[in-house]
Amino acid sequence: MDKNWTTWNTQALQALDRGDIEQAERAFRQACVSGDPRADSNLGWFYFLMGGSVRDSEAEARYWIQKALQRSRHPRILQNIARLRFENGDFAGALAALQEAHQASQSPVLLYNLGVCHFGLGDKAAAAACFREADAANAADLLCAQCGAVHPRLAYAFCVQGEERTAALRRYAPERNDMELWDYVLLCVQCEAYAMAAPVLPELVSQWALTEQTLAMTALCLQHVPAEKERVLRCFSDELSEERDRLLHLLGDADECARLAASQPFFPPPATHEGYFTEECL
């Protein structure tokens, strides 16, 4: 092992912890002088995570991670290249990299991301199997709180149809977190479980952007559970009079309401894996 590389790598990660992005970039680049593919991968992952805050970050991320992959098929490098491919809409390429990584290293995050790729490719059966397995690993807290994903039960529910989707909704409902409220209401609407969504509508219209689809989902639920109408309308302040009027209009137009409620389909966000090689995994 190149001690010089590990030293620079540690300094880079410490700089990141301090929020010193420029020093982290310099140290990651210095680590790459060693020629170790893990150093190349770390630099690429740094650029990916920095996004537009660092000049030419997308091209740099692609260059360094691809360079690392040419010399190592380590599961972490494979997951890094998979995420780049996913962000570019190359679901097939991302899936291939994740499947190769999965042969060497299994984890709930990897399983979940396999499901996301299958979902993107339209293979809902394969996606459902992955989400079900990730859920069985009791990894929901890890996926949602640390990785930016959604509960695997929620993702699974959108992969199945009919009675199984309704059953999946009921299994998921007690586990719902606040960040998944919009998706939960969408799932309720698709399952025609309007009574399940009705109690959370005030929270929805108070905390989420009042897009056409949000208003349409709300109206659709209120059409079936009219007792909640006044409670929901009280959530609209004077500054939101236009949105309130739009909601009232949609309540009287069932066709437009149904069309708008289905305008943006659900798509599970990928889980952000641990992309850096740290001292613990060297």
Regions found by a protein language model. Name each.
Residues 1-5, 144-147, 180, 231-282:
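Terminal, low-structured helical/coil segments at or just beyond the last alpha-helical repeat
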Residues 2-16, 41-45, 79-80, 112, ...:
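Alpha-helical tetratricopeptide repeat
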Residues 3-34, 48-52, 180-183, 187-188:
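Alpha-helical segment of the N-proximal tetratricopeptide repeat
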Residues 6, 38-40, 76-77, 109, ...:
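Start-of-helix register in tetratricopeptide repeats
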Residues 13, 45, 49-52, 83, ...:
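Residue-level recognition of tetratricopeptide repeat
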Residues 29-33, 66-70, 99-103, 132-136, ...:
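Conserved structural position within tetratricopeptide repeats
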